Amino acid sequence: MRKGDEKRQEMLAVAERLFCLKGYEATSVQDILNVLHASKGGFYHHFASKEALLDTLLYQRAARALEQTELALAEETRDMPRLNRVMYGFMPLRREEADFAAMLLPMLDKPEGRALRLSYQQALVETFLPVMEREMAQAQDAQVICPPAEDMAEVLLDLLSQCWIDLALLLLSGVKKAQRPDAAALLTMLEKYRRTVERLLDAPFGSVEIITLGEWNEVAEELSRRLLLPMQG
């Protein structure tokens, strides 16, 4: 790796750590530079703004999620579970993503949150689309799902994007009222999307699993706890 690329990766690593520790909005470019003992000129050589740096992080997280998904797929031979693994890997509200999700959630319902949601959706869809197309084709060949319409993989990923965003906003609405997560409402919403995906694919009843209920309960509780801490302080 070239020296310039190393410095860029170092900036990304430090920024991600600070964003997760202090929050994105509470972290300034200068905070990042102070850790790196770098100049503003050095920062702006690599990134046009803090927002541009965050966009790069979103693509990095998506690429990392895909790597983890491919590792999981290497150990799974059954077609429907493979599709489930891709859907699970696509979702940012997984146990492994709790730190990053807790950093993003407070911004989602703000005016700038729409741009953030669109940026993350674009990063995830672009990254996961080839593997989703591949796995859907294999499942179709195995007659696990019915022949999907053209561009159905992208439609499915857009649906999953709306799923995690709606879950996050519902969780956030409870936090703003200083309430613990409404487990029943969250599970109802997750089940609504699960059934929609199942119908979209014409998959066997009960075969689609976006994320296990146990893990989602755990993640929702953890995200709620982290988001409530600043309000209690």
Which positions does each model-derived feature cover?
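Amphipathic, non-transmembrane alpha-helical scaffold segments
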Residues: 58, 62, 117-129, 157, ...
